[in-house]
Amino acid sequence: LGDVYKRQLLYVGKNTNRKLALFGIKTIGDLARADEEVLNSHLGKMGSILWSFANGYDDSPVKLENTHAPIKSVGNSTTTPKDLVCDEDVKIVLYILAESVAARLRENGFQCRVVEISVRDNELFSFTRQKKIDHATNITGEIAAYAYQIFKENYNWSKPIRSVGVRGADLVTDNYWEQIDLFSSVEKREKQMKMDSAVDEIRRRFGFYSIQRGLMYRDRILSAVNAKEEHTVHPHGYFSG
């Protein structure tokens, strides 16, 4: 596999492929011979994961054929095409990521009860924060709103931001029943669910960019990312250790 193009390796998406190319890494063999610490400094934890895969290392337990690992969470992150310097920038990217996470949850028949964000600044300092939410959800607007709330409560803009992630965790199935308080707008949530389903269908038939939120037109560079198509649902078995 040493001469195989690196993009064929699991988890090497468009952005990661571009970063590796900056270091002259073109094949899986190049990646296997790279310095793991250098990869970590530029890709975070994913640097070690890619280095391990390129070298054939995988200590996850062997499973029988047709065994499916349970999905424990659905998340997505992106290194932005330019540094984020204000709340508006972050809001756009969080909505893009929330769209991909919510769509994956709906596709797999799940809702999340925890929303988590990750943030990395332009000096590569990173942190994660999460929030237990009132009602399980796979509604795009709700996940985005919670993610933005978490960000506002935890970042003071000491430095510009280079990378952002959103994750839905503590998953339950779509048929999960929970008591709704008297002040919750059930009709409003049902309308949002129908709207999300309609958007999913339009994008399935005509492509991701066939329908966009008005927010995305405020910055065409940041909104150019198709997070859902570049999204990989990570197998729980490898990352649970």
Regions found by a protein language model. Give the residues of each.
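DNA-contacting surface of Y-family translesion DNA polymerases
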Residues: R18-I161
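Acidic, metal-coordinating catalytic segment for phosphate/diphosphate chemistry
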Residues: A136-G241
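Short, small-residue-biased leader/transition segments that mark boundaries at the very start
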Residues: L1-Y5
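Short hydrophobic alpha-helical segments that form membrane-spanning helices or hydrophobic packing faces
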Residues: N17-F23, W51-S52, I211-Y217, L222
